[in-house]
UniProtKB/Swiss-Prot annotation:
<dbReference type="Pfam" id="PF10431">
    <property type="entry name" value="ClpB_D2-small"/>
</dbReference>
<dbReference type="InterPro" id="IPR001270">
    <property type="entry name" value="ClpA/B"/>
</dbReference>
<dbReference type="GO" id="GO:0005737">
    <property type="term" value="C:cytoplasm"/>
</dbReference>
<dbReference type="GO" id="GO:0005524">
    <property type="term" value="F:ATP binding"/>
</dbReference>
<comment type="similarity">
    <text>Belongs to the ClpX chaperone family.</text>
</comment>
<dbReference type="InterPro" id="IPR050130">
    <property type="entry name" value="ClpA_ClpB"/>
</dbReference>
<keyword id="KW-0547">Nucleotide-binding</keyword>
<protein>
    <recommendedName>
        <fullName>ATP-dependent protease ATP-binding subunit-like protein AmiB</fullName>
    </recommendedName>
</protein>
<dbReference type="InterPro" id="IPR003959">
    <property type="entry name" value="ATPase_AAA_core"/>
</dbReference>
<keyword id="KW-0067">ATP-binding</keyword>
<dbReference type="GO" id="GO:0034605">
    <property type="term" value="P:cellular response to heat"/>
</dbReference>
<keyword id="KW-0143">Chaperone</keyword>
<dbReference type="InterPro" id="IPR003593">
    <property type="entry name" value="AAA+_ATPase"/>
</dbReference>
<dbReference type="InterPro" id="IPR019489">
    <property type="entry name" value="Clp_ATPase_C"/>
</dbReference>
<comment type="function">
    <text>Unlikely to encode a regulatory protein. Has ATPase activity. AmiB and AmiS may act jointly into a two component ABC transporter system.</text>
</comment>
<feature type="binding site">
    <location>
        <begin position="96"/>
        <end position="103"/>
    </location>
    <ligand>
        <name>ATP</name>
    </ligand>
</feature>
<dbReference type="GO" id="GO:0016887">
    <property type="term" value="F:ATP hydrolysis activity"/>
</dbReference>
Length: 371
């Protein structure tokens, strides 16, 4: 019967299409399983996306490409889990003047990896400048009070990090530490361990990113740039590579005068941060406004600023010697204080909707209008 024959042919075609689709799905599933197996092998210890972490860092740290490149290279090695297991995952010394982002890059990294800008162990080396204060890091010797307690400056849980993510420790202002403390750090860089003086406890840094900061060479670099600016333009070196080589030479010479060659030689990376320039300051102002808006979320309001306001803050906040800290003072004086006064006098919580305020210049003063 023609009708039944057509139905049978249609059923066969449908069955063939379903079988072909099933074969395609099986092939795709096999490829997906192989892809996941490959990824899971790399995820056996660390589970984070280096590209996503770097996106967070580049949004927070501006004008410091060499430092960001060093951190990106480090993240790839750590994520692939091919770092030397007998040493810290990574060790770096960040050099440069104040207010250029040496500590901020560590905060941004902690925020990206652990969701908390304070999710790292920070040791202020300024408090360890005297020999008798070294016990705060290395622990009290045997027979002294607190010998079995270890150091009060390190938290092992922050050194270990969170599941699938490395820990972070920052030794701030390294040049101010006593020689005994630097010698203890030599052992940390060498084998990833810090044994307290009593021998009762050992701190492990083998799952840790070790960062150190220092203001060494800041004055030398400033004088170098000032001499360059006084030269006739015909005598100025062409390009920035010459400046980079000169500064690297100055930094290395100063490092070897301050620290032992054994210590410097065990660092994975030494990065000199750039001065904050005018073009970077303009972008930093926008970043500070974004941070202010995050703090305003709890009040259900947000801030928008005209280009004139942003330019005024950038002009007042540009100070090459003091970097971003001078900019933050400008933001506080020209934006946060007037905004706080306006909110205290005029802000009325709405019905749950977000209130937007526009900051504009009026007779060189910042005024706010509700939009």
């Amino acid at each position: 019967m023609p009708f039944l024959s057509d139905m049978l042919d249609q059923s066969r075609r449908q069955q063939d299409e379903e079988q072909a689709l099933a074969r395609e799905n099986l092939a795709e599933a096999s490829l997906l399983q192989a892809h996941l197996s490959h990824r899971s092998a790399l995820r056996s210890r660390f589970r984070f996306d280096p590209a996503a972490v770097m996106d967070c860092l580049r949004a927070e740290v501006l004008g410091q490409d060499p430092a960001l490149q060093a951190v990106e290279d480090m993240l790839k090695v750590v994520r692939a889990d091919i770092a030397d297991p007998r040493r810290p995952l990574f060790s770096a010394l960040f050099l440069g003047p104040t207010g250029v982002g040496k500590t901020e890059i560590v905060r941004a990294l902690a925020r990206a990896l652990h969701g908390d800008a304070e999710g790292f162990c920070r040791v202020d080396m300024n408090t360890l400048s005297q020999e008798h204060y070294a016990a705060a890091l290395t622990g009290a010797p045997p027979g002294y009070v607190g010998a079995k307690e270890g150091t009060t400056l390190l938290e092992q849980d922050k050194l270990d990090g969170s599941p699938g993510r490395p820990g972070i420790v920052l030794f701030d202002e390294l040049e101010k530490a006593s020689p005994e403390v630097v010698h203890a750090l030599l052992n940390v860089l060498d084998n990833g361990l810090l044994r307290v003086a009593s021998g009762e406890r050992t701190y492990h840094f083998r799952n840790t990113l070790v960062f150190m900061t220092s203001n060494l060479c800041a004055h030398e670099i400033q004088r170098y740039d000032e001499r360059r600016q006084r030269l006739p333009w015909r005598l100025l070196p062409v390009g920035g590579e010459r400046r980079r080589r000169d500064i690297d030479g100055m930094v290395r010479a100063r490092l070897l005068k301050t620290f032992s060659p054994e210590f410097v030689n065990r660092l994975d990376s030494v990065v000199t941060f750039n001065w904050i320039e005018r073009d970077v300051v303009a972008r930093l102002v926008e970043l500070e406004v974004q941070r202010l808006n995050r703090r305003l979320e709890k009040h259900r309001c947000r801030l928008e600023a005209t280009p004139e306001v942003l330019a005024k803050i950038a002009r007042a906040g540009f100070d090459r010697q003091f970097g971003a800290r001078a900019l933050r003072r400008s933001v506080r004086h020209h934006l946060e204080v007037p905004l706080a006064e306006h909110l205290l006098d005029h802000h009325q919580p709405g019905d749950g909707n977000c209130t937007t305020y526009l900051a504009s210049l009026e007779h060189e003063r910042v005024r706010f209008v509700r939009r």
